[in-house]
Amino acid sequence: MSNPALLVGYDSSDDAAVYRVSDEVAVIETVDFFTPIVDDPYLFGQIAAANALSDVYAMGGEPKLAMNLLCVPNCLPKDDIRAILEGGHAKAVEAGCVIAGGHTIQDNEPKYGLCVTGFVHPDRILKNVGAQPGDVLVLTKPLGSGVLTTAIKADLISPAARDAVYAHMATLNKKAGNAVRSAKNVHACTDVTGFGLLGHSYEMASCSGVTIRLHGATLPLMDEARDMAEMGIIPAGAYRNMDYVKPHLTVLPTAQQVFLDLAADPQTSGGLLVALPREDAEPLLRELQTFAPWSAIVGEVSELRATALEFD
């Protein structure tokens, strides 16, 4: 439905809807929930909440109000249900966001997430559209959560690497979002989640009418992610992501398969992907690296060539 107050809808593959309520205020609305990817219920609540809140940061806003979405089987202990909600609440408090209630239904498998409301000035919305030739792409979190959570199920990674991936997934994009909002000339922004870096880069390129080239050798990776990918520990979602982008992707002869696999890896609560001119990316990187030292330039934007996406 067309409405002049709807500033961002579903047509541009953006992370959230944005609705203008005045000349000074626009409302950001998003929803996200999923099944557990970790055994600890409190940690699951933290990760699910961080993942849902991320969409507001990706749009250049600040989350302010949220509602719980919870699906629980009859057999799930009440202590586990409480722990899930407490984990989500802890992340909302960290974000400065109030959870005002929610809705619970019975289901065969646990699911948890948030419906989040945030605010942004109508003239300062960050969108998936707008990447320009000459821009570079900055990524604020390392890749590999899909590969590593798959490896954890088989007890293949070290306790240190396991704890590190959990910490990355539970980390809010709040500080990164603040840094991006303060940066000059940000032309486009999204967060890297289920479609992987390849999928989300393709959507940005396609919606912007440009070609994005990603550099495998510069991708920041979580500890032991490369080792697991080289062993063939690739989640099914990575193959689906590759199938999705394949018609729009040129893989150059210099590309290494392991980096291509990790670029397709579906992420949970991944980082922000930001398009801006190189001269403005350098001060942004300096700011990001004070709290996220893995932040890196992972690609660049050019005029549209044969395909929307290139990988070397």
For the regions a language model picked out, list residue spans one by one:
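Helix-biased detector of long, well-ordered alpha-helical tracts
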Residues: 1-312
